[in-house]
């Protein structure tokens, strides 16, 4: 069994964002400012609640982040959709990390619950993605549950996050 890298620095994540980590035409992360985490602290193809693998990542929050001045003026809060997008980003990264081919695209999610907010006073956001299944057929599909914590308190939960890897048709 090949041992895969189990954590990634910001610089390594940017390599993935440039499409240089998993090869041309394969999974890549968005670049800043849409990249919603600074490091992957742990990734494994086993373990987690379903023993199908997991990802853990962190995002350093500073008051000067791009979304605070515009969402909302005088009442800054990180848009909830950005936290959800981070979960999809990490789900797609996992599929590429497994060595699966294709470009990653978010497909859907089951239920999303927001019970708190990220404000300029928040210091650290943590993400957890716990895989339930990876299907390998005409397309590769990852299905996972996710959570997001702000300074240690769980504030977002998402079930049945789905990301597919799509390969371009020849011709």
Curated annotation (Swiss-Prot):
The active site is at 71. One of its GO terms (molecular function) is trans-2-decenoyl-acyl-carrier-protein isomerase activity. Pathway: Lipid metabolism; fatty acid biosynthesis. GO terms for cellular component: cytoplasm. It is found in: Cytoplasm. Gene3D superfamilies: Hotdog Thioesterase. It comes from the Bacteria. The keyword Lipid biosynthesis applies. Its EC number is 4.2.1.59, 5.3.3.14. Pfam families: FabA (PF07977). It catalyses: a (3R)-hydroxyacyl-[ACP] = a (2E)-enoyl-[ACP] + H2O; (3R)-hydroxydecanoyl-[ACP] = (2E)-decenoyl-[ACP] + H2O; (2E)-decenoyl-[ACP] = (3Z)-decenoyl-[ACP]. GO terms for biological process: unsaturated fatty acid biosynthetic process. Keywords: Cytoplasm, Fatty acid biosynthesis, Fatty acid metabolism, Isomerase, Lipid biosynthesis, Lipid metabolism, Lyase. Belongs to the thioester dehydratase family. FabA subfamily. Homodimer. Necessary for the introduction of cis unsaturation into fatty acids. Catalyzes the dehydration of (3R)-3-hydroxydecanoyl-ACP to E-(2)-decenoyl-ACP and then its isomerization to Z-(3)-decenoyl-ACP. Can catalyze the dehydratase reaction for beta-hydroxyacyl-ACPs with saturated chain lengths up to 16:0, being most active on intermediate chain length. This is 3-hydroxydecanoyl-[acyl-carrier-protein] dehydratase.
């Amino acid at each position: 069994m090949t041992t895969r890298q189990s954590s990634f620095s910001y610089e390594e994540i940017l390599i993935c964002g440039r499409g240089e980590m998993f090869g041309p035409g394969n999974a890549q992360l968005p670049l800043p400012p849409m990249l919603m985490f600074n490091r992957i602290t742990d990734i494994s193809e086993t373990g987690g609640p379903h023993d199908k693998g997991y990802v853990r990542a962190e995002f350093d929050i500073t008051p000067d982040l791009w979304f605070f001045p515009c969402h909302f003026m005088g009442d800054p809060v990180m848009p909830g959709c950005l936290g959800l997008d981070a979960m999809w980003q990490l789900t797609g990264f996992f599929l590429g990390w497994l060595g699966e081919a294709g470009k990653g695209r978010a497909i859907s999610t089951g239920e999303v619950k927001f019970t708190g907010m990220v404000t300029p006073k928040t210091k650290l956001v943590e993400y957890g993605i716990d895989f339930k299944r990876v299907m390998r057929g005409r397309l590769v599909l990852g299905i996972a549950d996710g959570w997001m914590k702000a300074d240690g308190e769980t504030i977002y939960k998402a079930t049945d996050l789905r990301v597919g890897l799509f390969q371009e048709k020849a011709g």
